[in-house]
């Protein structure tokens, strides 16, 4: 696993521990300066008073994670082998060399947003399993779940193997989620919880089948979105829809 210490990575790792899907090792990316997107800060936001466990189909079952628990604490408690990398750039030659030297063929990727994996990293032969915060191929790009809320009154998450094109690799699993009971906590809690749910289900399917099964081998079409304007984000947060009763 390649992970930055964000709320997303904290949700992932706690979910993997809870479901006994431990990574063989975790390489931790240090925090860069002035390069964080929503959901990628130090994850100090408080979680909701109660997890929405009664949502339909238990879709928000991973929302009860603790966003204030640092990765190092979760790693130590679970006894997972971990090492902090010296560089924050996933495409740095030293980072690429270290990843290439690992025996693992697949890495769960939970780094900082806004960075595409370069051709040198992809040429190592490793596969990078990423969970995109959006329903593919319809919603590609950044902060897509706010656009999804405005367009469909739903959130999405899709697991895929990364390629050189943004959010365009083959999709293993994708799910839609009802609006969370507290839309103000999307960045630090519910976006991460939706992705964690899809990640866990993707890995559970692999554990059962012994291979990677794809929901969408040709991830084409859809729209690519850019970081949402604060006014539109505010509207998405404050506009309750038909699905908001699950809290």
Which ranges hold each PLM region?
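One-carbon transfer enzymes
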Residues: 1-247
């Amino acid at each position: 696993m390649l992970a930055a210490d964000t709320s997303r990575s904290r949700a992932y790792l706690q979910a993997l521990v809870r479901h006994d899907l431990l990574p063989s090792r975790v390489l931790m990316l240090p925090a860069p300066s002035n390069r964080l997107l929503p959901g990628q800060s130090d994850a100090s936001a408080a979680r909701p008073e109660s997890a929405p466990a009664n949502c339909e189909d238990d879709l928000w079952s991973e929302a009860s994670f603790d966003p204030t628990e640092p990765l190092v604490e979760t790693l130590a408690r679970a006894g997972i082998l971990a090492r902090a990398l010296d560089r924050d750039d996933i495409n740095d030659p030293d980072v690429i060399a270290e990843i290439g030297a690992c025996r693992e063929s697949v890495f769960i990727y939970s780094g900082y947003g806004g960075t595409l994996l370069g051709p040198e990293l992809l040429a190592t032969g490793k596969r990078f399993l990423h969970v995109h915060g959006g329903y593919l191929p319809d919603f590609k790009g950044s902060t897509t779940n706010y656009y999804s809320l405005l367009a469909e009154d739903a959130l999405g998450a899709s697991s895929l193997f990364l390629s050189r094109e943004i959010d365009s690799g083959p999709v293993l699993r994708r799910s839609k989620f009802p609006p969370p009971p507290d839309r103000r906590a999307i960045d630090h809690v519910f976006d991460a919880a939706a992705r964690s749910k899809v990640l866990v289900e993707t890995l559970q399917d692999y554990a059962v089948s012994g291979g990677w099964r794809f929901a969408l081998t040709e991830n084409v079409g859809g729209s690519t979105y850019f970081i949402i304007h604060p006014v539109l984000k505010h509207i998405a947060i404050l506009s309750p829809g038909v699905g908001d009763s699950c809290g």
